[in-house]
């Protein structure tokens, strides 16, 4: 029985929420394996809209186990708030259907303060962070000074962890002109939140492996997109974690052999939030039209997304680094009505044609797109549920994308509604 990893194959915001919800109906376990509460996802179920940023998408479905793995950095106050919000919307959340890795790292208020202070001091070279403390929390994890979920259970250990953290952070805060950490206030905050978090804490690696051996279907839910990966993204304009599919194993404690199918989520055009290179970006009327029709505003930040034509070079690259088995192509309906469509098929860098995005940031910034033009269509694709419902030009567009990215389409999404999906390959089938 195949276990499935879902990853964004662009810069995030590809429409993962709908696809994950569609798959989660048949999964037994839905696990998040990286990131924090910086990347939101929107679910539309029976006309009701749910906006999540930390909890796995499966939490809104009864009878599913939702898991927050050790690869996630966890803001405990945001967690408690998101749980309360969903409970207010009629969603049942208990330790029976939500599990948090004991070794997941906590995001503390000091992480957000540091994140925002750095961004304000770097006026010339902003990264485009959400300011929620994700990056600083990962820094503490790698620096071996982080506070983890399990530390909340022992007050003596917690105090030692806070003292170790303060040595590092107070030095940083002095340099940035921030007041020193109030040790007692931080400890009081952690003592207060601990009993609201600890009931969900479990040895996730152990439970996940038991589930696998029992033949349960596991869905690994990625956040953000592979082009924001700390190693393979447009560094330094990236997130602070690995986003590619291999992180699903590391971020939950299950072996890579457990992964059967990697589904890359790909928008039929390209968007990006925040700073960083974007070779196929459109700063004209076509770009505005894509943004308006696609409602391209961030779920968490509300920031307007930059829009551009489909970049086959980048998606081919992310399909390779994540070992994508098939893609889910979303938002095809946004392209309805364009007379001519363009696909980026290569880059020009100082007169040389490239078939990949170079790793150096200065070279990325100098890349200009090489386009191939395709005929558009005037008919509507919204709500199509079979290939026969699509205009011929739309089918040609999809087929050309498959050829250029060297990866087949497994699913085609034609609206935010979960049933408006054309299934080609079921990722859960053996």
Swiss-Prot record:
GO terms for molecular function: adenylosuccinate synthase activity; GTP binding; magnesium ion binding. Homodimer. CDD domains: AdSS. The gene is purA. This is Adenylosuccinate synthetase. IMP binds at residues 13-16, 38-41, 130, 144, 224, 239, 303. Binds 1 Mg(2+) ion per subunit. HAMAP family: Adenylosucc_synth (MF_00011). It is found in: Cytoplasm. Mg(2+) binds at residues 13, 40. InterPro entries: Adenylosuccin_syn_GTP-bd, Adenylosuccin_syn_Lys_AS, Adenylosuccinate_synth_dom1, Adenylosuccinate_synth_dom2, Adenylosuccinate_synth_dom3, Adenylosuccinate_synthetase, P-loop_NTPase. It catalyses: IMP + L-aspartate + GTP = N(6)-(1,2-dicarboxyethyl)-AMP + GDP + phosphate + 2 H(+).
């Amino acid at each position: 029985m195949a276990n499935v990893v879902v990853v964004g194959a662009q810069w995030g915001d590809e429409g993962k929420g709908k696809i994950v919800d569609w798959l989660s109906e048949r999964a037994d376990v839905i696990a998040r394996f990286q990131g924090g509460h910086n990347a939101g996802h929107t679910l539309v179920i029976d006309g009701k809209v749910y906006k999540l940023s930390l909890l796995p998408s499966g939490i809104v479905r009864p009878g599913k186990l939702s898991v927050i793995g050790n690869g996630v950095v966890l803001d405990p106050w945001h967690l408690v708030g998101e749980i309360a919000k969903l409970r207010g919307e009629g969603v049942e959340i208990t330790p029976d259907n939500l599990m948090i890795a004991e070794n997941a790292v906590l995001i503390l208020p000091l992480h957000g303060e540091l994140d925002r202070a750095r961004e304000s001091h770097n006026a010339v070279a902003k990264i485009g962070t959400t300011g929620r403390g994700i990056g600083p929390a990962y820094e503490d994890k790698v620096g071996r000074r982080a506070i983890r979920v399990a530390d909340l259970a022992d007050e003596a250990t917690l105090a030692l962890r806070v003292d170790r953290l303060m040595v590092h952070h107070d030095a940083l805060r002095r340099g940035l002109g921030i007041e020193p950490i109030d040790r007692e206030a931080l400890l009081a905050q952690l003592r207060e939140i601990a009993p609201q978090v600890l009931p969900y804490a479990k040895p996730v690696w152990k439970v996940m492996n038991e589930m696998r051996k029992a033949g349960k279907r596991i869905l690994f839910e990625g956040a953000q997109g592979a082009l924001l990966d700390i190693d393979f993204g447009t560094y330094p304009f990236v997130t602070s974690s690995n986003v590619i599919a291999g992180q699903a194993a590391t971020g939950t404690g299950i072996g890579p052999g457990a992964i059967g199918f990697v589904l890359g989520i790909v928008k039929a055009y390209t968007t990006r939030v925040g700073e960083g290179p974007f070779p196929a970006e459109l700063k004209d009327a076509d770009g505005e039209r894509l943004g308006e029709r696609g409602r391209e505003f961030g779920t968490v930040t509300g920031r307007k997304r930059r829009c551009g034509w489909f970049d086959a070079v980048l998606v081919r690259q992310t399909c390779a680094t994540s070992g994508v088995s098939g893609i889910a192509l979303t938002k095809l309906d946004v392209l309805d009505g364009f007379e001519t469509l363009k696909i980026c098929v290569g880059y020009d860098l100082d007169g040389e044609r490239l078939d990949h995005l170079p790793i150096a940031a200065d070279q990325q910034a100098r890349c200009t797109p090489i386009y191939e033009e395709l005929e558009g269509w005037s008919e509507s694709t919204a709500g199509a549920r079979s290939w026969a419902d699509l205009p011929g030009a739309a089918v040609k567009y999809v087929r050309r994308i498959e050829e250029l990215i060297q990866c087949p389409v497994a699913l085609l999404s034609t609206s935010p509604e979960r049933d408006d999906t054309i299934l080609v390959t079921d990722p859960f089938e053996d």
